[in-house]
């Protein structure tokens, strides 16, 4: 089904005007949503547990409260804490302080779609999901445009949930560049699949396997790193700017011919079947339950996965090479320490 892009002109109702807005969490998305909304004239407070984020929110000029206090004061509550802690945060501090007619929002449908969080029937549930990390949501807003966003309504108790979702998207700058309406089911399942099969899981596995093939064949690890990882950004930037067409117009004929000949040998029908199995585990809730259960057990699996990944040869080689390439960005130890 085709969807239609919507813009600021399509946001007809200033549904957030006169509302007290509580942003729960002041991490990557939390700092961006709250600052952008404040800059567009909205009344924003922060709800966060004591710690660095609490101190940072106060430093940035926000009235900052506990999560329970902020919920009690607000008409619209946007939950931007990490997925894995939202359920306990909601049950302990948000749910007891909700009132009929409130609206609760999310930037990802995980906890609502998989029913880890159940909001009372007399409360609106909406979504505004920017398609980019928080630092880009903030930076592009300050530059006069924004990051596109998806919006959705899960529960419309007041009849105003869609207007609230769209006005929220407008308030953070997303409607300047485009909004797409979706559902909680669609956003959640597609987002998880994209992360697991392509953007994160699929991509890192492809890079690591390519690195292993080259080094096991006797090629220098440093050269293998450049061929399978360092140059990835150059190719992805071209695809981002103009699709496969621009990428193929920009590479050599040799590379383009190899693309057509060898790509299908790597991503075979069996790989497609494996991707379908990944999607099935997302759709039936297996992945969600595995993730939440691991968190509740103290994250033994996630910790083990992180330790294993940190010890990959490609990571060690890359860390050394990047020391000689300051042009690639921040130092590894400082990268993305944004509003933690």
UniProtKB/Swiss-Prot annotation:
Active-site residues, Swiss-Prot/TrEMBL: 108
Record domain KARI C-terminal knotted: where: 183-328
Domain KARI N-terminal Rossmann stretches: 3-182
Binding residues for Mg(2+) 2: 191, 227, 231
EC number: 1.1.1.86
Chain residues that bind Mg(2+) 1: 191, 195
Keyword Transport among record annotations: no
A Pfam family of this chain: KARI_N
GO BP annotations listed: isoleucine biosynthetic process; L-valine biosynthetic process
Superkingdom of this protein's organism: Bacteria
Function description: Involved in the biosynthesis of branched-chain amino acids (BCAA). Catalyzes an alkyl-migration followed by a ketol-acid reduction of (S)-2-acetolactate (S2AL) to yield (R)-2,3-dihydroxy-isovalerate. In the isomerase reaction, S2AL is rearranged via a Mg-dependent methyl migration to produce 3-hydroxy-3-methyl-2-ketobutyrate (HMKB). In the reductase reaction, this 2-ketoacid undergoes a metal-dependent reduction by NADPH to yield (R)-2,3-dihydroxy-isovalerate.
UniProt family annotation: Belongs to the ketol-acid reductoisomerase family.
HAMAP family registered for this protein in UniProt: IlvC
The name this protein goes by in its record: Ketol-acid reductoisomerase (NADP(+))
Lineage start: Bacteria, Bacillati, Bacillota, Bacilli, Lactobacillales
